[in-house]
Every structure is written in C-alpha cells, then in structure tokens.
Amino acid sequence: MTRVKRGYVARKRRNKILRANRSFRGTHSKLFRIANQQHMKALRYSYRDRACKKRDFRHLWITRINAVVRSYGLNYSRFMHQLRLGNMVLNRKVLSQLASLDPASFNRLIRAT
C-alpha cells in the first residue's frame, strides 16, 4: 500500500477551522486542537439556539401584547379568546408590532373584539 502524505489536505482542513474561529479570543482562535473543540461547541450552540430564538421571540411578543392589553382592562388570554371568537386571525408577531408601532389601530382592534 502506498504512503499518503496529508500535508496539503490536513493544512487545508486546519486552516478552515482556524478561519472560522478568527473572531474567538485567545487560544480558541490560535491552536488547532482547542479551536476545533470550540468550533464544534459553537456549532452545537447555534443549532440549539435556533430553536430557542423562536421561543424567545414568541415570549417577547406575548409580553408586549399583554402589557398593552392590560392598560385596557383585559389580560392576554381573554384578549386572544375574544379575537378567536370574533374570527380575527392575527398572529402574535403582527399583534405585537401593531401594539407598539400603531397604538390607534390596536385601540380600534380592542374595541372591535
């Protein structure tokens, strides 16, 4: 069996990881072995946090809607229930934007429910 010298391929693989870690601090961007571990950990975090991001934004929207709706004497769950009874199909993102950017329209929406 012939000998395979991996100089070019190995260097290319290592440089790819080190380039990805360029913005990391200390040895996480300098030494390959530590940088590789940190790169794998960063990929795990990014995978996990893509799901968390959706959850966090939904939580933010609900909090914003609840804060505005309480000033009208309702709470979030009753408001959403009244929207469903009135066949008004608006998602939480749109309701949150409406509440913060256009309070007059949101006021009309609450009066309509």
Swiss-Prot record:
A single GO molecular function term of this UniProt record: rRNA binding
Q: Please provide, in alphabetical order, the Gene Ontology terms of the cellular component aspect for this entry.
A: chloroplast; ribonucleoprotein complex; ribosome
Give me the disulphide-bonded residues: none
Keyword Lipid biosynthesis in the entry? The reply is no
Could you list this entry's UniProt keywords, alphabetically sorted: Chloroplast, Plastid, Ribonucleoprotein, Ribosomal protein, RNA-binding, rRNA-binding
* Example of a GO biological process term: ribosomal large subunit assembly
For the keyword Ribonucleoprotein, the answer is: yes
Q: Which family does it belong to?
A: Belongs to the bacterial ribosomal protein bL20 family.
Q: What does this protein do?
A: Binds directly to 23S ribosomal RNA and is necessary for the in vitro assembly process of the 50S ribosomal subunit. It is not involved in the protein synthesizing functions of that subunit.
NCBIfam families, alphabetically?
Answer: rplT_bact
What's the protein called, per UniProt?
Large ribosomal subunit protein bL20c
Lineage summary: Eukaryota, Viridiplantae, Chlorophyta, Nephroselmidophyceae, Nephroselmidales
